[in-house]
Structure formats: structure tokens, C-alpha cells
């Protein structure tokens, strides 16, 4: 699988938060090697490839698990229950919570607006979006528009690396698209 756990750090306090830890061991090894404490675990949604490391990381570091209130019964170890449009602020971490249903009904995006970083989980990928498992196509469309409304300089971090496979799907549907052809060449390098 090409799941991507992402981390943010506070260099002064030697603390970090991780978004969607699919597994614990690589994160534990990295943080211990760097002498960094994992303070927060942020979950965009309940799928196992995004929460698989929650319990082991919480046990290892005493981390605080953060997730969407309406999905709390499906997120193991959850401690902080977030609402749509809430500003979550803890230590030096600050993010606006954006409810983005479609892939799942309880999916959220963490928008670290001061740093201009958004963690979209499985809502948005490079050249694609997540599958609709629980939500509707209308919800996904609205969710993608919420992400689209973020400032242009916002860096988007998605939950998986599917760019090459998504590009193959796109080029089948638009074989004469020169911009897409250039993008595929860049991806393959």
C-alpha cells in the first residue's frame, strides 16, 4: 500500500503530531532516533490504514488522539473530539477542522492555515479523489469545493500516493491532453 503518514514538529519543545498513522513501528523508530515526543495523533477518518498505529503510538508516547466527534466510536483511543469549522489549538499546533464527507461520512481535513498546510486524508489525491464508501457523490463534490476554496498557496498533503495510477486513468479519458502528458512524464522521472 502507498499510505502516507505525515508529521509536524515543534522544534523548540521537541514535540510532534502525526496525521493518519497507518502503523506505529516506523514512526516510533524515527521519533526515538530524533529524540522527539509524539504529543498528538490526528486522524482524518476511521479507515484502518489511517488509524492502525493509534493504540501502539499512544501506548509508547502517551500521545493524545484527535479526531472527528461524529466518528469517535470508530477511532481507537480518541481523546479529543472535534467539530466542523472548529479551530483546534494545542501547544504550538493550530488547525481549522473542515468536515469533508464523501469517502466516509466522518471524514475531516486538518487545515494548518498559518503554515498553509492541509491534510486531506482520502478526500483529495494528486489527479483524483477518494472512493465513495459511505457518503454521496454530492457530498464529495461539496467537500472538494471546500478544499478548492483554500488559499492557492496552501500545500495539500493527501493520504496515499496514487499519482501514477490516477494519471493512467486520466489519460485514457483525455488522450490528447498535452498538460496531462507532460505531467505523466514528470511523474515517471
Mark where each language-model region is.
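Pocket-edge positions in alpha/beta enzyme catalytic cores
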Residues: 3, 16-19, 132
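Metallo-beta-lactamase
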Residues: 104-189
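Active-site HxH/HxHxD metal-binding segment of metal-dependent hydrolases
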Residues: 16, 23-99, 116, 183-186
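Conserved hydrophobic/aromatic beta-strand scaffold that supports enzyme active sites
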Residues: 18, 87, 109-111
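Single conserved hydrophobic/aromatic residue that forms the stacking wall/gate
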Residues: 1-12
Amino acid at each position: 500500500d502507498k499510505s502516507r503518514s505525515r508529521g509536524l514538529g515543534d522544534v523548540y519543545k521537541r514535540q510532534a503530531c502525526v496525521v493518519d498513522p497507518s502503523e506505529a513501528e516506523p514512526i516510533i523508530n524515527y521519533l526515538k532516533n530524533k529524540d522527539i515526543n509524539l504529543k498528538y495523533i490526528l486522524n482524518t477518518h476511521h479507515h484502518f490504514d489511517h488509524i492502525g498505529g493509534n493504540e501502539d503510538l499512544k501506548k509508547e508516547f502517551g500521545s493524545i488522539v484527535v479526531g472527528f466527534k461524529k466518528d469517535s466510536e470508530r477511532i481507537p483511543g480518541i481523546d479529543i473530539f472535534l467539530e466542523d469549522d472548529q479551530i483546534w489549538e494545542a501547544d504550538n499546533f493550530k488547525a481549522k477542522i473542515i468536515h469533508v464527507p464523501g469517502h466516509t461520512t466522518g471524514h475531516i481535513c486538518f487545515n494548518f492555515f498559518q503554515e498553509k498546510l492541509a491534510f486531506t486524508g482520502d478526500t483529495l489525491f494528486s489527479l483524483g479523489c477518494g472512493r465513495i464508501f459511505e457518503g454521496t457523490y454530492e457530498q464529495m463534490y461539496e467537500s472538494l469545493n471546500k478544499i478548492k476554496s483554500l488559499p492557492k498557496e496552501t500545500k495539500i498533503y493527501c493520504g496515499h500516493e496514487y499519482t501514477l495510477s490516477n494519471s493512467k486513468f486520466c489519460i485514457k479519458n483525455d488522450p490528447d491532453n498535452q498538460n496531462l502528458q507532460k505531467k505523466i512524464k514528470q511523474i515517471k522521472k
